[in-house]
A protein has these predicted regions:
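Short beta-strand segments
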Residues: 9-11, 60, 111-114, 144-148, ...
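Conserved core of the sugar-phosphate nucleotidyltransferase
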Residues: 122-243, 263, 313, 338
């Protein structure tokens, strides 16, 4: 039985679609996006605590964010904050954490999650993860959490579920699907067995290490060499030398789409990847004109369907805008139509 629950939190992204709030020096996972007094990574840790103590949580992040992680999660052991010398996508990031966990926790049962998503119904989230952990505790199985779609979304990948297993709520995965066009997304919604891929995975340590050895032998051999230095003074130098030699590849391409033992647990817990200003607007409280705001004293006159985020400013006044983003951070101001928000990446360069 794999009953030693561990959690891996991926926190290396730069959140470029949320400029100017999110910057390469201080990306969105470390920001109080919702105006609740907690950053997204702190909210992630908070909702996982009933499942797993902080001492059993691991954060994988870019070297330059290590200081921020230590500040925001002060009770996390320093050994559990893993530094990526450079971004190599999610497969090397997850493999590094799993190999390090395995060295001290051979019976680990693991949850992998992004750091920058939002969950509204935390008790249902905890129930779903506990169910998945129970399934993987004694099986050679990878469980991916599928989010029941509420709309024909073109910004997410999808999981196609096949036949149910003998365990209630858990289905075999038929296929992973790339981000669809609108027509295909509408077909997925109508079919009823397609779910959003939230990037939340559950597996035991032997299942994932065997899968990586089978489908990504080069990655496994690099990890084996790195592991010789884990928990020693040489670790930083060895990881700094070897990690950048890993192929840049996502865990979906590296393992999920190849493995035979993939299952999904469809869920509804108010999930959003907070991938855009538009998605943030829909999740924040709105006034009767559809405006959402985060800040101390934001006054809107004759405005409709706007999102205003200016937590640093003592007073902001906006008049006469319809469907706009107004965001200020560290002396940088963005005023942009929500219809054009896909261009924000280039605006922030």
């Amino acid at each position: 039985m794999y009953n030693d629950i561990q959690v891996i939190i991926m926190a290396g992204g730069v959140g470029s679609r949320f400029w100017p709030m999110s910057t390469p020096d201080y990306p969105k996972q470390f920001i109080d996006v919702m105006g609740v007094g907690r950053s997204l990574i702190q909210l992630t840790v908070d909702r996982l605590k009933p499942i797993c103590p902080v001492e059993n949580m691991w954060v994988v992040t870019n070297e330059k964010y290590i200081r921020i992680v230590k500040e925001q999660i002060p009770d996390m052991p320093v050994d559990n904050i893993l530094s990526e010398p450079e971004a190599r996508n999610t497969a090397p990031c997850i493999a590094y954490a799993c190999w390090k966990i395995q060295k001290k926790h051979p019976d680990a049962n693991i949850v992998v999650t992004p750091s920058d998503a939002l969950v509204i119904n935390t008790s249902e989230y905890q129930r779903v993860l506990s169910k998945a952990l129970s399934y993987t505790s004694d099986k050679n199985a990878i469980v991916t959490i599928g989010i029941k779609p509420s709309r024909p979304e073109t910004g997410y990948g999808y999981i196609a579920a096949a036949e149910p297993t003998s365990v209630d709520e858990i289905y075999k995965v038929e296929a992973f699907k790339e981000k669809p066009n609108l027509e295909t997304a509408e077909q997925y919604l109508a079919a009823g067995n397609y779910y959003w891929n939230a990037g939340i995975f559950v597996w035991n340590i032997d299942t994932i290490s065997k899968a990586i050895r089978t489908y990504q032998p080069n990655l496994a051999s690099i990890m084996d060499e790195m592991a010789l230095s884990f928990y020693t003074e040489q670790e930083k130098e060895v990881v700094g030398r070897l990690f950048p030699t890993c192929e840049k590849i996502s865990i979906d391409y590296a393992v999920m789409e190849k493995s035979k033992e993939i299952y999904t647990l469809p869920a509804e817990f108010g999930w959003s990847d907070l991938g855009s200003w538009g998605s943030l607007r829909t999740l924040l409280p709105q006034d009767e004109a559809g405006n959402a705001k985060v800040g101390k004293d934001i006054r809107l006159y004759e405005c409709k369907n706007c999102v205003v985020h200016a937590a640093d400013e003592s007073k902001v006044v906006v008049q006469g805008l319809n469907g706009y983003i107004v965001a200020e951070k560290n002396g940088q101001l963005l005023v942009c139509s929500l219809k054009e928000e896909q261009r924000i990446k280039e605006f922030g360069k």
